[in-house]
Amino acid sequence: MKLPGKIAIMGGGSWATAIAKIVLAQADSINWYMRRDDRIEEFKRLGHNPAYLTSVRFDIKNINFSSDINKVVKESDTLIFVTPSPYLKSHLKKLKTKIKDKFIVTAIKGIVPDENLIVSDYFHQVYGVPEENIAVIAGPCHAEEVALERLSYLTIGCKDIDKAKIFARQLAGHYIKTSVSPDVAGIEYASVLKYIYAIAAGICSGLKYGDNFQAVLISNAIQEMNRFLNTVHPVERSIDDSAYLGDLLVTSYSNFSRNRVFGTMIGKGYSVKSAQIEMEMIAEGYYGTKCIKELNKHLHVNMPIVDAVYNILYERISPMIEIKLLTDSFR
């Protein structure tokens, strides 16, 4: 296996576009899989993604676009998957080329629905990719700030630390700092949880709770995250590292956070469906909430914030009532 070898971006959204920008700062060229031919043609004509991060310009001659996932996989050594988790299986259904000899990087911040597996486990169990050939990318890092080249930090998780370091060097640049970690599962679960807590923060904002309460909410959220991670994947970790606490903070507080925006709309009285229609973007935390709730039926971790968000989104309990109950459980 060449590492990183020829890199492919698998997805066409804002995070995929940001990662392509980061990779192309070091790589001479990339392969780029996008599902829609019309989007590819527009990209080539305009010199930028026509739908996401439109301010980011690309030198098109350095990008080999294709809507054929098998062609892209065959011609690449490292595959960076950057699609919303609910759509991953539909993309992979078209895949006839084996990927177990590729280096798989997941920048997907979610759990595969129906399977209730984090993405690294899904690639390992379903596609036979060795665990040491799977890496994850974690923040704190908003795509919009990558577009602006604001200083950002990425953590690369891989059970093979040497491979993590090689790939991390491929991403490092003047505005991207990188670190590595062997805690693949912990980083992935933390990425799912941060979206749920960002929705909670948004709901509270929509209900006009102030900064004082938001601080208490996030303090309790990091404790809840720590309890869950220590139960589902008990390894030594520092929960205050940027891949855990840092990513949680930026996702919960930033105006770029679509999950916080989604939560704010729910807090203001929008239904789930109307909020999703108005946003026109995927709020991963909506799907992640149900997945974590299902997982926790077997783990029995005390997770009052996740429970509250689930009750609001799926049981249609009034946000005002549910958050009031939550406030009574905090200290």
Question: What do the predicted segments below correspond to?
Answer:
Residues 87, 98, 126-133, 151-238:
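Internal alpha-helical scaffold of NAD(P)-dependent oxidoreductase catalytic cores
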Residues 74-75, 193, 245:
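Alpha-helix C-terminal capping/helix-to-coil transition sites in glycosyltransferase folds
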Residues 1-56, 63-67:
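NAD(P)+-binding Rossmann beta1-loop-alpha1 motif at the extreme N-terminus of oxidoreductases
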Residues 56-65, 129-133, 174-176, 301:
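A short helix-to-beta-strand connector/capping loop
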Residues 4-6, 102, 152:
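Nucleotide donor/acceptor-binding cores
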Residues 66-74, 78-149, 167-169:
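Rossmann-like NAD(P)(H) cofactor-binding subdomain of soluble oxidoreductases
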